[in-house]
Structure formats: structure tokens, C-alpha cells
């Protein structure tokens, strides 16, 4: 039996309400050494997409050939992208306090949480 917690944060949200499904791309797997390169999200309500969000994030470093091959994101795509604080500020405005859902949420939430801490933004989401 898997007894891990499925919902983190406030427990009074239902899946009939609006929630945000999101995904990130990064320069690697280690939250303490790597950086976010893209954030994508949609708002779902009653199973329908209501809003969309996408931004690249400038990691201020070159990508490895492995990451380029895995994500399809190139250095050229990131050179004029927003810096982390601006990208996260825009993402948090888009989320607007709604619950978050992600495949492998611990990974994605970990990077968003670390990024917010690094740039001084509050981030205490409800997520599944």
C-alpha cells in the first residue's frame, strides 16, 4: 500500500473547482544545482482548459547537449527569456492561489519552491 500524502496544503479544495496543471523543464535533476528553463500551465475547470500560461526562463548558463536533446529547448530560445524572478512572479499571478497538479509534483514543486525562496517570493501551494 502506498501511504504517501496525495494532497499537500489546505484540504478544502475539490477537483470540481478550478485548478492548475503545470510542468517545468530544467537544466538537470538536482534542485540545489540546476535551474528552471520553462514553465507551462493550464487552468482546468470541469475538465476544460480555461487559460494557458507558458514562459521560458533564462538559466544564465549554457544547456548541455543531453538537456537540449531531452527537452528540445536551446540556448537560443533562452537568451532573451525572463529572469527567474520575473518568470515566477508571472506564474504565481497566473496560479492565483488555485491548487496545483503535476506529474511528479514533488520534483516540479521542489524547483518552484527553491526558485521562489532564491528570489524572495512566497510559495505555499496546495498541490497533488
Model-identified regions with their sequence ranges:
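Conserved non-catalytic scaffold segment of RNase H-like nuclease domains
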Residues: 1-127
Amino acid at each position: 500500500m502506498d501511504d504517501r500524502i496525495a494532497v499537500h496544503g489546505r484540504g478544502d479544495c475539490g477537483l470540481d473547482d478550478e485548478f492548475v496543471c503545470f510542468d517545468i523543464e530544467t537544466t538537470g535533476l538536482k534542485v540545489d544545482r540546476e535551474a528552471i528553463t520553462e514553465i507551462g500551465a493550464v487552468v482546468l475547470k470541469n475538465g476544460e482548459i480555461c487559460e494557458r500560461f507558458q514562459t521560458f526562463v533564462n538559466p544564465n548558463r549554457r544547456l548541455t547537449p543531453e538537456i537540449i536533446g531531452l527537452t528540445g529547448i536551446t540556448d537560443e530560445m533562452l537568451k532573451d527569456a525572463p529572469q527567474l524572478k520575473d518568470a515566477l512572479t508571472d506564474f504565481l499571478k497566473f496560479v492565483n492561489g488555485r491548487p496545483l497538479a503535476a506529474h511528479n509534483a514533488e520534483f516540479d514543486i521542489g524547483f518552484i519552491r527553491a526558485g521562489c525562496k532564491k528570489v524572495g517570493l512566497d510559495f505555499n501551494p496546495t498541490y497533488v
